[in-house]
């Protein structure tokens, strides 16, 4: 069984810990992508145009015998209206608000995707491909004292000592304006993801670290494929606590 070094809050190595079998799972990018896309689809809200969009006009057709097509035309004008091919007309087949856009994933596939994404967090090649900046040796396992940090300043000091804070700065200064219409729809900026901190149980660090740029803090019970592989790309830079490693034994089977 593989082992990993454990570090304290100053970044010094203080011992070793055995890694559970979940870190030996095969890398399955196909299952990871399937699970992440399903999670994103299941968050979608119903959307569609107004029932009367493009229909608010009194345009009527001229009838036969005038040498023009039988489309509705504005009053005192020859300009077409209402029909899909006219400017300002209705959509022919608009999105339906009643459509079911949710996706289902087999339970075994979803769990396999999580196991595979967990194993990818200790692969330096995959972590580097995601663009993370780090100096620490993977996997990064911290003592349980990390879970008791109550101040964001203390978390920053730990990340600096562990050689991970550069990745938080990458996310902080990597924010940029989104291309396309989304910037008008409440999602003006695109944000990068940085460090994922996994704790064994609900503890103060869940609030202490949550306001850092790109940082997510969760317990083992809340882990999912999207947290471990944002944007379907596995290999997220992850910090585990000793208790979190212990809870992974036999999880997601």
Swiss-Prot record:
Compositional bias per record (Basic residues), positions renumbered to this chain: 82-94
GO biological process, alphabetically ordered: translation
Region described as Disordered: 62-107
Keywords from the named record: Ribonucleoprotein, Ribosomal protein, RNA-binding, rRNA-binding
Biased composition, class Basic and acidic residues, residue ranges: 95-107
Family as reported in the entry's similarity comment: Belongs to the universal ribosomal protein uL4 family.
Job of this protein: One of the primary rRNA binding proteins, this protein initially binds near the 5'-end of the 23S rRNA. It is important during the early stages of 50S assembly. It makes multiple contacts with different domains of the 23S rRNA in the assembled 50S subunit and ribosome. Forms part of the polypeptide exit tunnel.
Name of the protein in question: Large ribosomal subunit protein uL4
Protein species of origin: Methanosarcina mazei (strain ATCC BAA-159 / DSM 3647 / Goe1 / Go1 / JCM 11833 / OCM 88) (Methanosarcina frisia)
Gene: rpl4
């Amino acid at each position: 069984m593989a082992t990993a070094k454990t570090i304290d809050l100053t970044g010094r190595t203080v011992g070793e810990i055995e890694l559970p079998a979940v870190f030996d799972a095969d890398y399955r990018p196909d299952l990871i992508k399937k699970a992440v896309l399903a999670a994103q689809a299941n968050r979608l809200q119903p959307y569609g145009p107004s029932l009367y969009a493009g229909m608010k006009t009194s345009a009527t057709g001229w009838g036969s015998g005038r040498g023009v097509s039988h489309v509705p035309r504005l009053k005192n004008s020859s300009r077409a209206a209402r029909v899909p091919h006219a400017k300002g007309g209705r959509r022919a087949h608009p999105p339906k608000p009643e459509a079911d856009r949710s996706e289902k994933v087999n339970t075994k596939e979803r769990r396999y995707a999580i196991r595979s994404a967990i194993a990818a967090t200790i692969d330096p090649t995959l972590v580097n491909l995601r663009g993370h900046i780090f100096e620490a040796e993977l996997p990064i396992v911290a003592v349980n004292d990390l879970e008791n940090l109550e101040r964001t300043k203390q978390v920053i000091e730990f990340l600096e000592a562990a050689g991970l804070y550069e990745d938080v700065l990458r996310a902080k200064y990597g924010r940029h304006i989104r291309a396309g219409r989304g910037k008008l729809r409440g999602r003006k900026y695109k944000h990068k993801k940085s460090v994922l901190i996994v704790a064994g149980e609900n503890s103060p660090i869940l609030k202490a670290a949550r306001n850092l740029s790109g940082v997510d803090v969760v317990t083992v019970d809340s882990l999912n494929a999207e947290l471990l592989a944002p944007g379907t790309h596995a290999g997220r830079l992850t910090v585990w606590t000793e208790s979190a490693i212990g809870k992974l034994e036999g999880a997601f089977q």
